Amino acid sequence: MKRLVSAFLAGAMALSLAACGGAASTSTAASASASASGSAAVSQTAGSDLDYIKGKGKPVIGYTVYEPMHYTDADGSFTGFDTELATAVCEKLGVEPEFVEINWDTKVVELDAKSIDCIWNGMTLTDDIMQNAATTKAYAKNAQVVVVKDGTDYTSTADLVGKTVVAEAGSAGEAAIEGDENLAQADYVSKSVQTDCLMEVAAGTADAAVLDLTLANAMIGEGTDYADLKIVDELNAEEYGVAFRKGSDAAAAVDEAFDALKADGTLQALADKYDLALAD
């Protein structure tokens, strides 16, 4: 399969989030690295990863921008299902979240380097991530879908053999392309973020995109900026979870917070607000 990697230059984002009991902040991976260096003393004295995170008081949460998980709304507020859920969990743990935009393709590298403390961004619980990180239980359902322009003839992935197909680098969409007999014969182009994939299909520079159902439901179709795009196929079902450093005890603490938020109705209310299905 021919692979072309396109370069992406992203400007640094300065965003703010109103959180329960305090204001959550956003920054870039560069500032997260500085934060990690400044937390060296905490790391040396912490008895566990959870102690390390609580000692800092601000878990650094790695994310990429895409609706409905993490995005800036029409009022300029940083929000989303994962944004609100992470904030609610942090409140349970007695800490304040700091959201840092990352390169999704190097997410585990940044996690291990302590540039970030967790990956929380509609992250599919793949075998690879579960082998290389400590993951929480699944909290939401998702699927990888094929998105094309209206009017495109499509009956199966066989129609995309030799065509240009895009997905986010290092994503479950990329894995779905590599694992599909027909899509593996497409002219695959990786993109830095999923939203770029929609832009490519809309512009006609790509024939199809493979990306998250959650994003497609929120960003394409009538009433959106991509009204002429449509979902034509669902490739596989999957679930979202959160990843911490391998061996971390923080994942179990987040699981307990999930249970509490499910019991008090917060988790279901967020799912209803953002039109997501919770994991069983």
Which residues does each predicted region cover?
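Bacterial lipoprotein signal-peptidase II cleavage site
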Residues: A18-S39
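Extended ligand-binding regions for polar small-molecule ligands
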Residues: A23, T83-K92, S171, N217, ...
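Extracytoplasmic small-molecule ligand-binding "clamshell" domains
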Residues: A41-G122
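Short helices/loops that flank or line small-molecule/ion binding pockets
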Residues: E91-K92, V100-E101, D105-I119, N132-A134, ...
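A ligand-binding cleft/hinge motif common to bilobed small-molecule-binding domains
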Residues: M123-Q131, A176-G179, A202-A203, D207-N236
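Periplasmic-binding protein-like
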Residues: K141-V148, L213, N217, G221-D259, ...
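Flexible hinge/capping segments at coil-to-helix
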Residues: V148-V165
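Ligand-binding clefts/hinges and TM-proximal coupling segments of bilobed small-molecule sensing domains
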Residues: A172-S192, A227-I231, D259-D280
